[in-house]
C-alpha cells in the first residue's frame, strides 16, 4: 500500500469502485503525464444528490455531495494509474 492509500485509510476514506460511464464518454483520459477526469456527480444510495444550498439542501448536505465527488475523482485516478496513486 502506498503513501496516499495509507493517508486515505488514516482519514477513514474508502474508495468505491469507479462507476462505469453512464453515457457516451470515457471516465478519464491519459495524455502524456496528465490524467483528465470527466465530470463526477454526487450519487448517494443510488440517487443523485441535487438541490440549491439553503433552499432544497443544507450546507452540510452540499459539503457531503462535494466530498462524494472528490472521492469519486480519486477513485477514477486510482483506476487510471492501475492502483498506484503515488
Give the positions of each predicted feature:
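Short, polar/acidic, helix-capping and beta-turn segments at strand->helix junctions
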Residues: 1-86
